[in-house]
Amino acid sequence: MQFNIPTLLTLFRVALIPFFVLAFYLPFVWAPLLCALIFVFAAVTDWFDGFLARRWKQTTRFGAFLDPVADKVMVAVALVLVAEYYHSWWITLPAATMIAREIIISALREWMAEIGKRSSVAVSWIGKVKTTAQMMALFALLWRPERIVEGIGVAALYIAAVLTFWSMFQYLNAARHDLLEP
């Protein structure tokens, strides 16, 4: 297997996860900002690696597999850390909802690919809006410099949770005939 720059960026994103967790637990006043910046850097490389792979025509099967996995693991870890920090149901509930949705839709996409219908559950615009709201929420809730930023983060988290449900139902609806077929 030959590694290209987009794939190396994705691997780097995976390698950032332990440092991201470590930054979250550092006992310094600047640690939340460092943690949030690592998260944003990972989000930017998520966009950038896909852009470069398409632009340079360097898409690979390994990259196509690893990119969404790296994204989902980073987001799931961030959601767990945020839920752990706030230690309350009103943060844990949307976080758990988003993690569950990612597992359900990943399984659905894998199954649809297996039956040759992967394109019917391709990423939609609502999924992209959900991801944007999720990234904004997580950045704000990881950084949390002031109450107003936390409030914006919580609002964005709930917007992301609603969009999470909406997009999940869209994907399940698109696959319903195949799911319900005997």
Curated annotation (Swiss-Prot):
Per UniProt, what is the membrane topology? Multi-pass membrane protein
Ranges of the Cytoplasmic topological domain: 2-12, 82-86, 169-181
Matching entries from PROSITE patterns are given as: CDP_ALCOHOL_P_TRANSF (PS00379)
Q: Which UniProt keywords apply?
A: Cell inner membrane, Cell membrane, Lipid biosynthesis, Lipid metabolism, Membrane, Phospholipid biosynthesis, Phospholipid metabolism, Transferase, Transmembrane, Transmembrane helix
Write down the EC number. Answer: 2.7.8.5
Q: Name one Pfam family in it.
A: CDP-OH_P_transf
Q: Do the record's keywords include Transport?
A: no
Q: Which InterPro entries match?
A: CDP-alcohol_PTase-I, CDP-OH_P_trans, CDP-OH_PTrfase_TM_dom, CDP_ALCOHOL_P_TRANSF_CS, PGP_synthase_bac, Phosphatidylglycerol_P_synth
Instruction: Name where it's found.
Output: Cell inner membrane
Recorded catalytic reaction(s): these are: a CDP-1,2-diacyl-sn-glycerol + sn-glycerol 3-phosphate = a 1,2-diacyl-sn-glycero-3-phospho-(1'-sn-glycero-3'-phosphate) + CMP + H(+)
Q: Which segment of the chain is annotated as a signal peptide?
A: none
Q: Where are the transmembrane segments?
A: 13-37, 61-81, 87-107, 146-168
Give, as in the UniProt entry, the pathway in which the protein acts.
Answer: Phospholipid metabolism; phosphatidylglycerol biosynthesis; phosphatidylglycerol from CDP-diacylglycerol: step 1/2
Q: Name one GO biological process term.
A: phosphatidylglycerol biosynthetic process
GO molecular function: any one? CDP-diacylglycerol-glycerol-3-phosphate 3-phosphatidyltransferase activity
Q: Indicate the principal place this protein occupies in or around the cell.
A: membrane
Q: Which residues lie on this side of the membrane: Periplasmic?
A: 38-60, 108-145
Task: List the record's Gene Ontology CC terms alphabetically.
Answer: plasma membrane
What does it do? Answer: Catalyzes the conversion of cytidine diphosphate diacylglycerol (CDP-DG) and glycerol 3-phosphate into phosphatidylglycerol. Essential for the synthesis of anionic phospholipids, thereby playing a role in balancing the ratio of zwitterionic and anionic phospholipids, which is thought to be important for normal membrane function.
Q: State the family it belongs to.
A: Belongs to the CDP-alcohol phosphatidyltransferase class-I family.
Q: Which HAMAP family match?
A: PgsA (MF_01437)
Q: What is this protein called?
A: CDP-diacylglycerol--glycerol-3-phosphate 3-phosphatidyltransferase
Source species of the chain:
Pectobacterium atrosepticum (strain SCRI 1043 / ATCC BAA-672) (Erwinia carotovora subsp. atroseptica)
The gene for this chain is pgsA
